[in-house]
């Protein structure tokens, strides 16, 4: 995808915020527990390479990604000796590529290990489906057979075992405890404990520090976003959001009563009013459902009117502004703030989706 460096729309990523979130989390972890930075999906929209560098500077001991290509991108960017785990499914034919690049892979089926062609040792992490229902083995018998397979094959190393909690971001913990118990049953069935036992995502690491095991997978909260609104007031420290999204007005005009804007003419002025066109649209991740949401102009709310277009969006101004005036879509402006949580609430989604949707057509600028 082409990045739009030559238009006035950009994302600012505050590296100091990422470092602070990591340090605050590390301060509550035992020294024996590693923090792995989850940088999948372009670091939740924040930029995988720069975030990985920032996280490593802050003390992260490794990285988690969703697909092998993300792991290879880290290797190509210079992270040659760092621990990297692919959390998602990888094709069998790509196992050798991972092995040669010292990338750890998730294994969740016995048959995946059959007839592998490897030129180097493949490090694997056994995924346990303790109740998430996506990937993973579900019985002690499966776990023991996979352990035996890895023990009998000198090119396989059972480096880790893990699970993922479905409800760690909820205050009610009965299902979480049920998952943890099932995982522990499978863990204790192994003859030898792997080097890395890990279960905690951001929510679990924040609210259930006792289950850190050997490492935590620090994702959404590394970026300063709460895992869910339900637990926001129960967090052990304040999270510092790292992402801000800005643009500028490229056209300002006054509408007369009866004038309409955008596709479908769904918005019609009922009085004289000032509007501005912004060079950002749903092709950038500002999806059509943002219509009716507000941005900030000089600290004042300005609603998005009409339909969001592919490349442009129109807002209603509180008064006349000059072309080139700055607009805050996510971030702080003169004491007021629009957050990813605000957008998520309006869109009936979660903050993860808000930032992940912001694609690479919007340039990232890294500050602090």
UniProtKB/Swiss-Prot annotation:
Disulfide pattern: none
Molecular function (Gene Ontology), one example: alanine racemase activity
InterPro entries linked: Ala_racemase, Ala_racemase/Decarboxylase_C, Ala_racemase_C, Ala_racemase_N, Ala_racemase_pyridoxalP-BS, PLP-binding_barrel
Catalysis performed (reactions): L-alanine = D-alanine
Binding-site list for substrate: 134, 310
GO cellular component: cytosol
EC main group: isomerase
Cofactor(s) the record lists: pyridoxal 5'-phosphate
Gene Ontology biological process terms in this record: D-alanine biosynthetic process; peptidoglycan biosynthetic process
Pfam family, one: Ala_racemase_C
Modification N6-(pyridoxal phosphate)lysine occurs at: 40
Active site: 40, 263
Entry EC number(s): 5.1.1.1
Keyword field: Isomerase, Pyridoxal phosphate
Pathway per the UniProt entry: Amino-acid biosynthesis; D-alanine biosynthesis; D-alanine from L-alanine: step 1/1
SMART domains in UniProt: Ala_racemase_C
HAMAP family: Ala_racemase
Similarity remark: Belongs to the alanine racemase family.
Function: Catalyzes the interconversion of L-alanine and D-alanine. May also act on other amino acids.
Name the record gives this protein: Alanine racemase
Taxonomic classification: Bacteria, Bacillati, Bacillota, Bacilli, Bacillales
Primary gene name: alr
């Amino acid at each position: 995808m082409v990045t739009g460096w030559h238009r006035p729309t950009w994302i600012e990523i505050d590296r100091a915020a990422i470092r602070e979130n990591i340090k605050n989390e590390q301060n509550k972890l035992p020294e024996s527990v590693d923090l792995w930075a989850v940088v999948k999906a372009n670091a939740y929209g924040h930029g995988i390479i720069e975030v990985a560098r920032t996280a490593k500077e802050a003390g992260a001991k490794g990285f988690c990604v969703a697909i092998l290509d993300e792991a290879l991108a880290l290797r190509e960017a210079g992270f040659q000796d760092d621990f990297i785990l692919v959390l998602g499914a990888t094709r069998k034919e790509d196992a050798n590529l991972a092995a040669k690049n010292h990338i750890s892979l998730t294994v969740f089926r016995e048959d995946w290990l059959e007839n592998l062609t490897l030129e180097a040792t493949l490090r694997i992490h056994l995924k346990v489906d303790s109740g998430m229902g996506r990937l993973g083995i579900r019985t002690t018998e499966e776990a023991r057979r996979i352990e035996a397979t890895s023990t009998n094959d000198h090119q396989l190393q059972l480096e880790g075992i893990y699970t993922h909690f479905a409800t760690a971001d909820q205050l009610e913990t009965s299902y979480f405890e049920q998952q943890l118990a099932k995982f522990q049953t499978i863990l204790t069935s192994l003859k030898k404990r792997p080097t890395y036992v890990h279960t905690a995502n951001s929510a679990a690491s924040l609210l259930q520090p006792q289950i850190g095991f050997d490492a935590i997978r620090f994702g959404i909260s590394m970026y300063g976003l709460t895992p869910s609104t339900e637990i926001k007031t129960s967090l052990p420290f304040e999270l510092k959001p790292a992402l801000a999204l800005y643009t500028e007005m490229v056209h300002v005009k006054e509408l007369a009563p009866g004038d309409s804007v955008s596709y479908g003419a769904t918005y019609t002025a009922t009085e004289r009013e000032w509007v501005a066109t912004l060079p950002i649209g749903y092709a950038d991740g500002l999806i059509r459902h943002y219509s009716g949401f507000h941005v900030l102009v000089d600290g004042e709310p300005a609603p998005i009117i009409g339909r969001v277009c592919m490349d442009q969006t129109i807002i209603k101004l509180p008064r006349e502004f000059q072309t080139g005036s700055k607009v805050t879509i996510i971030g702080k402006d003169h004491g007021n703030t629009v957050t990813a949580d605000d957008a998520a609430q309006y869109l009936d989604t979660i903050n993860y989706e808000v930032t992940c949707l912001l694609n690479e057509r919007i340039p990232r600028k890294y500050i602090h």
